Structures are given as structure tokens and as C-alpha cells.
Amino acid sequence: MRVEVGQIVNTHGIKGEIKVKSNSDFTDVRFQPGQVLTVVHNNNDLEYTVKSHRVHKGLHMLTFEGINNINDIEHLKGSSIYQERDHEDIVLEENEFYYSDIIGCTVFDDQETPIGRVINIFETGANDVWVIKESKEYLIPYIADVVKEVDVENKKIIITPMEGLLD
């Protein structure tokens, strides 16, 4: 299964380094040197092997093997980056999920009233925050007091909203 792991937002310097906005989890594994990433550009799949990875100002800075010049990579700005998930050997703990399994789930309150769909996830340090969108956008902390049930197979999440969370 191929999952989107980020988007190339810009280049950095003249030696072919790119800035990637990640929309994925386990970036320390996904972007480590030697990992193969697929960049989709003009409906073409281009495979690249990660040469180096570092984090700078909240963005992931990557270089690819065989790319040593900004001119070789600049045309990929705005392109999405994918990775095969089938080969992952990441062991998930209880109540830990891949972002790609959570994004797209429908969120309901504990009365089974639909609230919206998870459209994004971001990390805050203490816990992840799920961005839920329907007619409004809500920020739902992924904590036990709020998220009561996650059914990945049926793409369904049940929450008990704290006071003011959905206002």
C-alpha cells in the first residue's frame, strides 16, 4: 500500500537539498538514509533514495542519491512524496495508529452524532492533534479523556468532547 508522506515545498541551497512538509508519522524511519521515496510529478512516478535527512524549522530537509544540484530537483517543488507501507517493520503500541489509517475516518460524538472527518494530524509534543472538518474545523487532542474508540477497519472514531471543544 502506498501512502503519502509529504510534499516538497521548496529547495534549500544550491546542492539539491529539498524542504519537505511531512504529513506522516515515523519520519525518523521514513526519511532515514537508504529509504526509497516516490515523487509524483506530472503524473510520473520518480523513485529516489534518501541520501541525508535533517529537521530544520519544522521541515524535513532531504537530499537524494545522485542529486547534487538545485537544477536537478527544483522542478519538483509542489510534488507529493509517497512511500510503500507494506515493508514497514514498525511495531505499533496499543492505541497507536498510522496517520494514514486515521486520516479519512469519520468522527462521532458519544451520542453517535457525526462531527466530521479527520483531514490532518499534527504533533504538539505532548500529544497529537487531529484536525476534523465538516461545516467547521475542530482541533481534537488525541488523549484518552477525549478519544474513546478508534475503529480503523470501519473508519470510525468515537469521542467524548470536553466542554467547549466543539464550540
Curated annotation (Swiss-Prot):
InterPro entries: PRC_barrel-like_sf, PRC_RimM, RimM, RimM_N, RimM_N_sf, Transl_B-barrel_sf. One of its GO terms (molecular function) is ribosome binding. It is found in: Cytoplasm. One of its GO terms (cellular component) is cytoplasm. It holds the Pfam family PRC_RimM. Keywords: Chaperone, Cytoplasm, Ribosome biogenesis, rRNA processing. The keyword Chaperone applies. Residues 94-165 form the PRC barrel domain. An accessory protein needed during the final step in the assembly of 30S ribosomal subunit, possibly for assembly of the head region. Essential for efficient processing of 16S rRNA. May be needed both before and after RbfA during the maturation of 16S rRNA. It has affinity for free ribosomal 30S subunits but not for 70S ribosomes. The PRC barrel domain binds ribosomal protein uS19. Belongs to the RimM family. Binds ribosomal protein uS19. This is Ribosome maturation factor RimM. It comes from Staphylococcus aureus (strain MRSA252). The gene is rimM.
